[in-house]
Regions:
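Peripheral, non-catalytic segments flanking oxidoreductase cores
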Residues: 1-325
């Protein structure tokens, strides 16, 4: 297995000097190469304070260590018929071996009737009863990751077009469908599945992500692997407690007309308890995944979908989003 297959990109100069600085082109080229050839890279010196990540991890543990009877109170209707949500909230480990908590944009409120009338928009559960600081901690981290996503996305846009305002068009809060997810892997006794390709025991099945990109933090090495698109060989993603793992999603593949492809990844079975926190950076529901936004003029290979329709179709393959009508 090749060492250093996943490149690390130091964002310090981009964070300090901005997207229009003399340093942005060099970093843009690094991101372009990693995204086009591999679909995964890590970033360090990303501007998100590590103390905020530590506080978030502690808050996560506090929630997941609650009795199941408490957590299920904020589960979607599939597990708790007394709640109003279908997607947002807690899902138990019976789904796919891990517990989870899905949180949407905290800027979405009950008085935004036009948005919450749509199937994909739900106001987050009030969890201040668990911790008075919960809402502040979650909102603050969501903002940090949204801003980091915007910085990386604008850097990607700059590879193809000078029109960086496309990012502002694509990500109009609270119209975005971005999701902050907490994954809690308890000490697992058996794998989720056995890989049909190489017989390896898995804690999370092989898949690609749907959004523009995913920004992932892991509290410890969790067995994340990436598949080489050409050789089909699997490579470990190195763990760094000061880094985020970035992977390009299917929406970015559509938007770049196949230049930056979504990449298969999986998680090896691991009996050690751990937490991972992916932020699925997803655009406004009505944003069209049209390559012309990036000055890519050839005919789209995929057809042009608004993101809401695209996401609805993409999520059908994920068991945790299998919901009754």
């Amino acid at each position: 297995m090749q060492n250093n297959y996943i490149p690390n990109i130091d964002l310090s100069k981009l964070v300090s000097n901005g997207i229009n600085s003399q340093y942005s082109k060099e970093i843009a080229n690094q991101i372009k190469k990693a995204s086009e050839e591999i679909g995964f890279f890590t970033v360090t010196n990303h501007g998100v304070p590590l103390t905020k990540i530590d506080i978030l991890l502690n808050t996560c543990r506090k929630f997941f260590y609650l009795p199941e009877s408490e957590k299920i109170k904020i589960a979607p209707k599939k597990w708790n018929p007394h709640t109003e949500t279908v997607y947002r909230g807690y899902f138990p480990s019976s789904v796919n071996g891990k517990e989870g908590l899905d949180i949407g944009d905290p800027q979405l409120t009950h008085d935004m009737k036009d948005l919450i009338s749509k199937q994909t928009f739900e106001v987050n559960h009030d969890m201040s009863y668990l911790d008075p600081q919960w809402q502040f901690i979650i909102n603050d981290y969501f903002d940090e990751l949204h801003n980091l996503g915007m910085l990386i996305f604008k850097t990607i846009i700059s590879v193809y077009s000078p029109n960086l305002s496309v990012a502002d068009t694509a990500f109009q809060r609270p119209k975005t469908l971005s999701t902050l997810r907490f994954n809690f892997y308890p000490k697992q006794e058996r794998p989720v599945e056995i890989s049909a390709q190489d017989g390896v025991a898995l804690g999370c099945e092989t898949h690609v992500d749907s959004g523009i990109m995913t920004i992932l933090y892991q509290d410890k090495k969790g067995g994340l692997q990436v598949q080489n698109r050409n050789t089909l060989e699997w490579h470990d993603v190195p763990h760094n407690s000061e880094a985020f793992v970035i992977n390009t999603g299917l929406a970015l593949e559509y938007l770049t007309n196949g230049r930056m492809k979504a990449t298969n990844h999986r998680v090896l079975f691991n009996q050690e308890e751990r937490i991972s926190i992916p932020f699925f950076f997803e655009p406004s529901f009505d944003f069209k995944l049209d390559p012309k936004y990036l000055d890519i003029v050839e005919e789209s290979k995929y057809g042009i979908d608004c993101y809401e329709d695209f996401l609805t179709n993409s999520l059908k393959k994920f068991v945790e989003y299998d919901r009754p009508n």
